Amino acid sequence: MEVMSDKNIFNYPDTNSSRAGIEFLNRKFEKQKIAIIGLGGTGSYILDQVAKTPVKEIHIFDADVFQLHNAFRSPGAVSSEKLEAENGIMKVDYYYGIYSNMHAGITAHSKYVTLENVSELKDFSYVFISIDKNEVRYNLTKAFLNMGVTFIDVGIGVNKSELSEWCCSCYSWND
């Protein structure tokens, strides 16, 4: 079993990795800098998983307020008392409050990522795009490709009014 170092990014010992014998994998993550754009249903689950890895930094970006419908689309269960007490809290602040208990490298950004500020993400190891606005996703995708940023687009961005156009057909990011 590997001994935990003082530079551990977790706020308490990661006994899961040693139990599974995968400490060697953790070394591959130690210098990674991850950005998660959007903390809706998909983005919050990405954060839930990434926060349990020893990546150096996790930056979360979202300018939306955590609302009742988000409680049904996020990991865990939010109490009705907490929903009422934290009414109007930003998504990034809500999730930071939870996941910073475990991971010391989380930074919350209460803003949208746009073409005007996307260059701030040029030095990230990986960027997860998990937003529901197709035009913004398309623009960010093009920007990341142009900057050479490694990204994963995981949002679906399907609205009921669009279903007739999308039903039984393939969607392409090509112009």
Where is each model-derived feature located?
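Short amphipathic alpha-helical segments
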Residues: L47-D48, F72-R73, N139-K142
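E1/E1-like adenylate-forming module used to activate ubiquitin-like modifiers
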Residues: D123-D175
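Glycine-rich adenosine-cofactor-binding loop
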Residues: I22-V65
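A structured beta-alpha segment of the ubiquitous adenosine-cofactor-binding alpha/beta core
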Residues: M90-Y126, I131-Y138
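Conserved beta-strand segments of alpha/beta enzyme cores
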Residues: E57, G105-T107, T150
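Glycine-rich phosphate-binding loop and adjoining beta1-alpha1-beta2 segment
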Residues: A63-H103
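Short His-Asn-centered micro-motif
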Residues: I36-G40, F61-A63, S110-K111, I129-D132, ...
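Glycine/serine-rich phosphate-binding loop and adjoining beta1-alpha1 elements at the start
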Residues: M1-Q32
